């Protein structure tokens, strides 16, 4: 996905689920406990760290700065990608199952604010914000144009083959 490393997506998921009203917090905590057990069952932080280093390195090598999230650009300029990722994994609560389970168990209505300072969440927020502001609008325009052109193509096909019966296909292109 756009985030690459599992910890980045996990940070966004936990934040979203803990950012609920006090009335819904206990239900969210129970759901998160089960999800955390599943997540950490076969999670390997060392592997995830290597993946994140390579992914961010590739961003910086292959994209122009206007296509790189701000957090990634700052990381590259300040410490370098490898040092940034090492710090992220050493300081993130979410890199360790025991710390995450403790965070969930002790969660209060304000716990999500603590996650806002977590380096994995900050990276996730930067990437998601960048995607929402820069990539999604362009992607939506392209998809709209593809839909419009598919309709023109189908109308032309039906006009060329008036005796043929056309059926909708599974992915809704017809």
Model-derived features: where do they sit?
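Terminal presequence/propeptide segments associated with secretion/organelle targeting
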Residues: 1-174
């Amino acid at each position: 996905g756009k985030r690459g490393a599992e910890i980045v997506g996990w940070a966004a998921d936990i934040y979203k689920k803990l950012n609920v009203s006090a009335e819904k917090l206990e239900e969210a905590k129970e759901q998160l406990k089960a999800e955390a057990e599943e997540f950490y069952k076969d999670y390997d932080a060392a592997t995830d760290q290597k993946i994140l280093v390579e992914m961010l390195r590739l961003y910086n090598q292959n994209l122009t700065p206007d296509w790189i999230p701000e957090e990634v650009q700052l990381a590259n300029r300040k410490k370098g990608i490898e040092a940034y990722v090492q710090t992220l994994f050493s300081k993130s609560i979410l890199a360790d199952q025991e710390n995450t389970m403790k965070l969930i168990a002790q969660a209060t209505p304000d716990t999500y604010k603590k996650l806002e300072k977590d380096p994995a969440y900050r990276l996730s927020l930067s990437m998601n914000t960048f995607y929402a502001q820069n990539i999604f609008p362009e992607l939506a325009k392209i998809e709209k144009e593809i839909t419009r052109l598919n309709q023109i193509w189908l109308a032309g096909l039906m006009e060329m083959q008036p005796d043929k019966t056309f059926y909708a296909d599974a992915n809704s292109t017809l």
